[in-house]
């Protein structure tokens, strides 16, 4: 897959394209991209996914804090695992936000990206204030020589899969359902930072994550079975993560603490990927650190048994 930043484009060869933010590159997105690639091959054209370098709402509302399923880098990596030829990254700014759908289709899709067919997700809208409808896109496309095609929704158990649906599952701690919709486990990336060192005192040293730079959604508070790896390695290690405010220690700040099994290395300031497997329990307040330590031992056994069953 060729990754092309919009400012670097002279002009693309004629292509079949789709446009969207593609947060998470979930199974609904994969379903659309599969149809896109199939059509492009039949037509003898290149296939192109057009996305943005920033969440549109973040550009329009400076104080908006997005809850992303993927970073731009992880999104591009996921797109590269499809069979699409090109990923075009548009720089979304206020000037682009002010463009009508007709202007965007003419100036960006037609004149610059050489789009001949445009696949639109079943619920996708674009253009200033998202004011226009699919029928408008079809009419504009007809004028410009772009065939506009609406892709059907991808469903699981009668539910239309979308990034919003996946976020809802994660906020409930339903990481297994989120993984079913994504097609892979939900994964956070963060920098390992100094914590409160309470886990080490309890016999469970943890890697504490700061994910503020990446803007990803944090699943519901609780204890999770996870797999982790450092960004520059390929080996996934088993572990368990606590998401919460440390109520036993009267904490108020949300923390992400990961105990990596059979590991006690120094990984401060490194980037760690955490892949969520299953929520073991909700967050609890214990009467003493000793009671918490006993529960952590139970949690560890629960997680180890879970991984053994998955390995069978």
Predicted feature locations:
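Extreme N-terminal starter segment of soluble prokaryotic enzymes
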Residues: 1-3, 14-15
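Short acidic-hydrophobic, aromatic-tinged amphipathic segments that line or gate anion-handling sites
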Residues: 2-8, 88
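N-terminal catalytic cores of NTP/NDP-binding nucleotidyl/phosphoryl-transfer enzymes
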Residues: 8-71
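Residue-level signal for inorganic ion chemistry
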Residues: 26, 79, 118, 178, ...
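Cofactor-binding loop segments of dinucleotide-utilizing enzymes, especially the Rossmann-like FAD-
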Residues: 52, 92, 153
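N-terminal Rossmann-like or analogous alpha/beta NTP/dinucleotide-binding catalytic cores
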Residues: 58-144
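Glycine-rich, Lys/Arg-enriched anion-binding loops that position phosphate/diphosphate groups
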Residues: 141-242
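Phosphate/ribose-recognition catalytic cores of enzymes acting on nucleotide-derived substrates
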Residues: 195-312
């Amino acid at each position: 897959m060729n990754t092309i930043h919009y400012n670097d484009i002279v002009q693309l060869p004629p292509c079949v394209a789709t446009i969207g933010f593609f947060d998470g590159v979930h199974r609904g997105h994969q379903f659309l991209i599969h149809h896109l690639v199939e059509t492009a091959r039949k037509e003898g054209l290149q296939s192109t996914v057009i996305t943005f370098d920033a969440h549109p709402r973040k550009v329009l509302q400076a104080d908006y804090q997005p809850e992303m399923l993927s970073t731009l880098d992880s999104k591009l990596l996921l797109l590269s695992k499809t069979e699409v030829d090109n990923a075009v990254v548009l720089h979304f700014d206020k000037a682009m936000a002010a463009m009508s759908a007709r202007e965007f289709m003419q100036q960006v899709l037609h004149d610059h990206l050489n789009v001949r067919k445009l696949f639109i997700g079943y619920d996708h809208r674009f253009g200033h204030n998202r004011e226009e409808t699919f029928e408008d896109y079809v009419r504009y496309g007809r004028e410009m020589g772009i065939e506009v095609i609406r892709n059907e929704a991808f469903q699981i158990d009668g539910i239309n899969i979308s990034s919003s649906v996946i976020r809802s599952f994660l906020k409930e701690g339903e990481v297994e359902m989120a993984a079913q919709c994504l097609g892979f486990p939900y994964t956070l990336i963060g920098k390992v930072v100094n914590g409160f060192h309470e886990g080490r005192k309890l016999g469970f040293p943890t890697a504490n994550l700061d994910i503020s730079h990446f803007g990803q959604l944090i699943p519901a508070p609780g204890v999770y079975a996870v797999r982790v790896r450092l960004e520059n390695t390929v080996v996934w290690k088993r572990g368990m993560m606590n998401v919460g405010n440390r109520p036993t220690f009267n904490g108020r700040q949300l923390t992400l603490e990961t105990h990596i099994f059979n590991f006690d290395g120094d990984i401060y300031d490194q980037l760690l990927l955490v892949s969520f497997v299953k929520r073991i329990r909700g967050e609890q307040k214990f009467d003493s650190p000793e009671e918490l330590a006993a529960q952590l031992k139970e949690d560890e056994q629960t997680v180890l048994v879970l991984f053994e069953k998955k390995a069978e």
